Amino acid sequence: MNNTAHSMSEKVLLVASLEAARYGQYQQAVKGLQAESGLLETHMIDRITDLAYAPPADYFDAVYMMLPSEGVEWAAALPKLRASMIPGAKLRVSVVNENDPSSFLSQVRAELTIAGFTDIQTYENASIESRRPASSSVAEKDSTASSGMGAVKLRRKPNENGGHQQKKALLWATQPETHMDTEAKLQEHARTVSPASRREDCTVDFSAPRTRRKRACKGCTCGLRELEEEDERNSNLVQLDPSEVGGTGGKRTEVTTTVKGPNGEEHTVRRIQVDTRGATSSCGSCFLGDAFRCSSCPYLGLPAFEPGQKVEIPANMDDDL
């Protein structure tokens, strides 16, 4: 490694590798630099690439590197070394024990260019030398002059009043704010019943919450089906049978008996005997159901039917409403 003479006031950094120490090149370089420079600092390449290490900024006048052709983290080492060098300082890289250093020097040349070094020169003794730019402002000035063009900042065109265009007001920002509670409107509509659907003598409270009994599903396993079957066995049926009609003038007679259903289960039945043939109706709508009957109608509570038709009503029918 051919070293350039240094003054005793210059600070020099030597970065080497284990290969350079194995072949004795590192020890020879240390002796030569100690005799020529005032202050010599030595580090292995692993120390430089360590993320925890940061060399002093703008400190060294020259940096020498003795490295192998492979296994060097240039992207981590060169930026640190460049920051530790004073402007205009030189960096010299030498390859250790390489038979064909041309490919190595080409790689190092590219890495030095990427790191921002200038004045890169290659020597026959398998070494390459470069320098840190003297000033970043000078480099920028030179690049601008060489291209013959400079960046021109574009200005916004002013309007007729001499000022910049004003932002247009949003259309919805000029309208008054209106708040509508959709949920409250829906609840109010559900509670309100139109007058056309209510009769004068209707006593049903439509504002009260309605309940619906849950029915057992097809594959019920929670016991609800057993409860329904028990309720069905104990339920009362209301039958209107024209063959058992007795009395006159629409009179109504109730008889409670126990009968067996088609499946052999017993049911308590309340029979209501009504003479529909003798009943009179001023409205003619008594047989259409409770919605068309007066409050004093003798058929109030019975479903819609025709004279002579058999009707059966479970006593717990109101659970489904």
UniProtKB/Swiss-Prot annotation:
An annotated GO cellular component: mitochondrial intermembrane space
Main location per the UniProt record: cytoplasm
Region span, Linker: 140-177
InterPro entries, alphabetized: Anamorsin, CIAPIN1, Dre2_N, SAM-dependent_MTases_sf
Motif (Cx2C motif 2): 294-297
Protein origin, superkingdom: Eukaryota
Keywords: 2Fe-2S, 4Fe-4S, Cytoplasm, Iron, Iron-sulfur, Metal-binding, Mitochondrion
Molecular function via GO: 2 iron, 2 sulfur cluster binding; 4 iron, 4 sulfur cluster binding; electron transfer activity; metal ion binding
Motif Cx2C motif 1: chain residues: 283-286
Chain positions covered by the region annotation Fe-S binding site A: 202-222
GO biological process terms held by the UniProt record: iron-sulfur cluster assembly
Free-text domain note: The C-terminal domain binds 2 Fe-S clusters but is otherwise mostly in an intrinsically disordered conformation.
Protein's job: Component of the cytosolic iron-sulfur (Fe-S) protein assembly (CIA) machinery required for the maturation of extramitochondrial Fe-S proteins. Part of an electron transfer chain functioning in an early step of cytosolic Fe-S biogenesis, facilitating the de novo assembly of a [4Fe-4S] cluster on the scaffold complex CFD1-NBP35. Electrons are transferred to DRE2 from NADPH via the FAD- and FMN-containing protein TAH18.
Database matches in PANTHER family: ANAMORSIN
Record HAMAP family: Anamorsin (MF_03115)
Family, per entry: Belongs to the anamorsin family.
Protein's UniProt name: Fe-S cluster assembly protein DRE2
